[in-house]
Amino acid sequence: MAMSLCPLLLVFVLGLGLTPPSLAQDDSRYRQFLTKHYDANPRGRNDRYCESMMVRRHLTTPCKDTNTFIHGSKSSIKAICGNKNGNPYGETLRISKTRFQVTTCKHAGGSPRPPCRYRATPGFRSIVIACENGLPVHFDESFFRP
């Protein structure tokens, strides 16, 4: 029994070594993007929502000045990276062809240390992102057209 597992284990270990490091890093950046900017089904979109989400997503040490949460499906956000739901925007960014429900949380001022106070701005707009290997990895907060 142990002898029959050795070839399988060898193939598995060799396969791990052949996984491109860039692929693993890209997936990590995508997961980080989701943590910072994705919330499929928000419960309320007010100041309290922003304050709890920013703490829950570890964006308050120090208090992040601005962060936007996208409310939609992961597949529709990923589609911005291709031609299905996205167009080129500037040199390296993509703009969505469709509008997304979003909540933008802005730091209300005061100390950059917790507890952080945020003001919520709910909206419905196009979003601009950066993509790597077909995955969103950065949300452009400077694009704020309704």
UniProtKB/Swiss-Prot annotation:
UniProt entry keywords in alphabetical sequence: Angiogenesis, Cytoplasm, Developmental protein, Differentiation, Disulfide bond, DNA-binding, Endonuclease, Hydrolase, Nuclease, Nucleus, Protein synthesis inhibitor, Pyrrolidone carboxylic acid, Secreted, Signal, Stress response
MF terms in GO: actin binding; copper ion binding; DNA binding; endonuclease activity; heparin binding; peptide binding; protein homodimerization activity; receptor ligand activity
A single GO CC term, please? neuronal cell body
TM stretches of this protein: none
The entry marks the following residues as binding tRNA, namely 45, 105, 127
Activity regulation, per record? Has weak tRNA ribonuclease activity by itself due to partial autoinhibition by its C-terminus, which folds into a short alpha-helix that partially occludes the substrate-binding site. In absence of stress, the ribonuclease activity is inhibited by RNH1 in the cytoplasm. In response to stress, dissociates from RNH1 in the cytoplasm and associates with cytoplasmic ribosomes with vacant A-sites: ribosomes directly activate the tRNA ribonuclease activity of ANG by refolding the C-terminal alpha-helix. In response to stress, the angiogenic activity of ANG is inhibited by RNH1 in the nucleus.
Q: Which residues form the active site?
A: 37, 138
Task: Write down the superkingdom of origin.
Answer: Eukaryota
One Pfam family for this entry, by name? Answer: RnaseA
According to the UniProt entry, what is the EC number of this protein?
A: 3.1.27.-
- Tell me where the signal peptide lies: 1-24
For biological process, the GO terms are: angiogenesis; antibacterial humoral response; antimicrobial humoral immune response mediated by antimicrobial peptide; cell migration; defense response to Gram-positive bacterium; hematopoietic stem cell proliferation; innate immune response; negative regulation of apoptotic process
Q: Where in the cell is it found?
A: Secreted; Nucleus; Nucleus, Nucleolus; Cytoplasm, Stress granule
Instruction: State the span of motif (Nucleolar localization signal).
Output: 55-59
Primary location class: secreted
Which Gene3D superfamilies does this UniProt record tie to the protein?
Answer: Ribonuclease A-like domain (3.10.130.10)
Q: Give the Pyrrolidone carboxylic acid positions (modified residues).
A: 25
- What cystine pairs are annotated? 50-105, 63-116, 81-131
| Biological role stated in the UniProt entry | Secreted ribonuclease that can either promote or restrict cell proliferation of target cells, depending on the context. Endocytosed in target cells via its receptor PLXNB2 and translocates to the cytoplasm or nucleus. Under stress conditions, localizes to the cytoplasm and promotes the assembly of stress granules (SGs): specifically cleaves a subset of tRNAs within anticodon loops to produce tRNA-derived stress-induced fragments (tiRNAs), resulting in translation repression and inhibition of cell proliferation. tiRNas also prevent formation of apoptosome, thereby promoting cell survival.
The entry describes its oligomerization and partners as: Homodimer. Interacts with RNH1; inhibiting ANG ribonuclease activity. Interacts with PCNA.
UniProt record similarity statement: Belongs to the pancreatic ribonuclease family.
Q: What is the name listed in the Swiss-Prot or TrEMBL entry for this protein?
A: Angiogenin
Q: Which organism is it from?
A: Equus caballus (Horse)
